[in-house]
Swiss-Prot record:
Positions that bind S-adenosyl-L-methionine: 28, 30, 55, 77, 103, 123
Organism (species): Rhodopseudomonas palustris (strain BisA53)
Protein name from the UniProt record: Ribosomal RNA small subunit methyltransferase A
Function: Specifically dimethylates two adjacent adenosines (A1518 and A1519) in the loop of a conserved hairpin near the 3'-end of 16S rRNA in the 30S particle. May play a critical role in biogenesis of 30S subunits.
HAMAP family per UniProt: 16SrRNA_methyltr_A (MF_00607)
Enzyme class: transferase
Enzyme Commission code(s) on record: 2.1.1.182
Amino acid sequence: MSTIDDLPPLREVIQRHDLSARKSLGQNFLLDLNLTTRIARAAGPLEDSTVIEVGPGPGGLTRALLALGAKRVIAIERDERALGALAEISAHYPGRLDIVCADAMTYDPRPLLGGARAKIVANLPYNIATPLLIGWLETDPWPPWYDCLVLMFQREVAERIVATEDDEAYGRLGVLANWRAQTKMLFDISPAAFVPPPKVTSSVVRLIPRDEPEPCNRRMLEQVTAAAFGQRRKMLRQSLKSLGVDPARLAAAAGVEPTRRAETIPVAGFVAMARELANIRGIKSEC
């Protein structure tokens, strides 16, 4: 039996349900229940919370969330082979686990929430982790339907999420993430903790949505960061030419020196340039 509940060990569950990880689904199962518990705890108190989990697989993190008292867990799993293992967990925690067999890239869990906000806690499949996060960060209207994200990524991606100006990993993802949320790298997880072990170290990141991010039009922000980081080694007066406006005037009007490079501009600078671009184009700046 496990250390967090009296359900069978995860290795036994995987063997009984023939849950060999599939590379095509980006699966790497985390079997150490001490680590899954640590991830679940990072989301804060769970007793009054509904938690969305993406890609539960054999249910290691699912079990940790429920054992720590999550009021309700909605597990979104594309792999039908895992449904039997998840059903066993549901029987052990009656009325607290909803299992949804769907592709998280297209499935919208909000109708299940009844207007309440949720936490999203997941060991995300590597092959969909970044687009899922971007989709959640681009949620409109804002504040979003979730109040906390605790997610596992490849360390390289995690570094991009939490990066700020002058960091080597700073780019479009860091601007979007830190504009709309407070981000923090929590801890690393060795490849040896997974079955099969990935080739890279994984990292757990927590994002807390900002109630009121600096106002700007999100699409204008995307265009500014795409232009600036698309030629990140060039000065803004050159890299922003693709926007179809005078780049030096755009930057200067936003209070940003046109001779600076994208990697040195803080999030507030990009937001200011996005607002100025929206003004030039006659587009509403509020997000």
